[in-house]
Amino acid sequence: MAEKTLTRMDLSDAVFREVGLSRNESAQLVESILTHMSDALVRGESVKISSFGTFSVRDKSARIGRNPKTGEEVPIHPRRVLTFRPSHLMKERVANGNRNR
């Protein structure tokens, strides 16, 4: 499996090469998209990208956990967690090793 990580710069470069915007415009576009997605998630909205997947925020309630080293019970505070659920197409694409681009 590849050890490379796709970064904002990689996305910006791809927009530059494939869409034809300037490097600056490409970077601004990527930032704008990520900002819109982040803002929606902060508001508690889901972000659904067709054929890719859905990002959503879930509220987890307080509960009692256990310290694995000591066995001592510790309270786990309520929190919001970000989840991603890939679409069926994305699951298939990953399972097929990206052969069906």
From Swiss-Prot:
SUPFAM superfamilies noted in UniProt: IHF-like DNA-binding proteins (SSF47729)
GO BP, sorted A to Z: DNA recombination; positive regulation of metabolic process; regulation of DNA-templated transcription; regulation of translation
Pfam annotation, one family: Bac_DNA_binding
Cited InterPro entries: Hist_DNA-bd, Histone-like_DNA-bd_CS, IHF-like_DNA-bd_dom_sf, IHF_alpha
GO MF entries: DNA binding; structural constituent of chromatin
Gene Ontology cellular component list: cytosol
Transcription found in the keyword field: yes
UniProt similarity note: Belongs to the bacterial histone-like protein family.
Job description of the protein: This protein is one of the two subunits of integration host factor, a specific DNA-binding protein that functions in genetic recombination as well as in transcriptional and translational control.
Subunit structure: Heterodimer of an alpha and a beta chain.
Record's protein name: Integration host factor subunit alpha
Annotated organism of origin: Dinoroseobacter shibae (strain DSM 16493 / NCIMB 14021 / DFL 12)
